[in-house]
């Protein structure tokens, strides 16, 4: 009988951004986003969890090295040491909140991990994080 496990890989990336919506006035942006309308950066902690049945013959359902390579290609190379609004074409015109960033990362990973992708968790700070499960 195979058992289902959840495997999580953690990565850290540094990105800069500002929270600003072109759909709002400057005053509305200031009211909603406060000082975050100015450019600033974060050392984001990303945790990607995949879920699957352990294969008896190999004792795992996915080699962690494969997950690490997918994360590097689909996420880290795009976001690490980048300005999210200026350097990531797919994020143009999107307010780069942690919520939207978690959805973006899910969308980048889903084609490669669709049978296994369970959760994307991003810690913006030690106390603030977002979890997205594809819903």
From Swiss-Prot:
Cofactor: Zn(2+)
Active site: 36, 81, 124
Gene Ontology biological-process entries: folic acid biosynthetic process; response to Gram-negative bacterium; response to oxidative stress; tetrahydrobiopterin biosynthetic process
Keywords: Lyase, Metal-binding, Tetrahydrobiopterin biosynthesis, Zinc
Pfam families hit by this protein: PTPS
UniProt superkingdom: Eukaryota
Enzyme class: lyase
Gene Ontology cellular component annotations, sorted alphabetically: mitochondrion
Keyword hit for Hydrolase: no
Catalytic activity: 7,8-dihydroneopterin 3'-triphosphate = 6-pyruvoyl-5,6,7,8-tetrahydropterin + triphosphate + H(+)
UniProt pathway annotation: Cofactor biosynthesis; tetrahydrobiopterin biosynthesis; tetrahydrobiopterin from 7,8-dihydroneopterin triphosphate: step 1/3
UniProt remark on cofactor binding: Binds 1 zinc ion per subunit.
Family named by the database record: Belongs to the PTPS family.
Assembly and binders: Homohexamer formed of two homotrimers in a head to head fashion.
PANTHER family in alphabetical order: 6-PYRUVOYL TETRAHYDROBIOPTERIN SYNTHASE (PTHR12589:SF7), PYRUVOYL TETRAHYDROBIOPTERIN SYNTHASE (PTHR12589)
Role of this protein: Involved in the biosynthesis of tetrahydrobiopterin, an essential cofactor of aromatic amino acid hydroxylases. Catalyzes the transformation of 7,8-dihydroneopterin triphosphate into 6-pyruvoyl tetrahydropterin.
Entry protein name: 6-pyruvoyl tetrahydrobiopterin synthase
Organism this protein belongs to: Dictyostelium discoideum (Social amoeba)
The encoding gene: ptsA
């Amino acid at each position: 009988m195979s058992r289902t496990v959840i495997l999580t890989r953690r990565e850290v990336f540094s990105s800069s951004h500002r929270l600003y919506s072109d759909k709002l006035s400057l005053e509305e942006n200031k009211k909603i986003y406060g000082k975050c309308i100015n450019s600033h950066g974060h050392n984001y902690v990303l945790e990607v969890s995949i879920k699957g049945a352990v294969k008896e013959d190999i004792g795992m359902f996915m080699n962690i090295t494969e997950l690490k390579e997918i994360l590097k290609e689909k996420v880290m190379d795009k976001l690490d040491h980048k300005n999210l609004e200026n350097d990531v074409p797919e994020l143009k015109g999107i307010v780069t909140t942690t919520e939207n960033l978690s959805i973006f990362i899910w969308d980048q990973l889903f084609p490669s991990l669709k049978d296994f992708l369970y959760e994307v968790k991003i810690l913006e700070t030690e106390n603030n994080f977002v979890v997205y499960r594809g819903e």
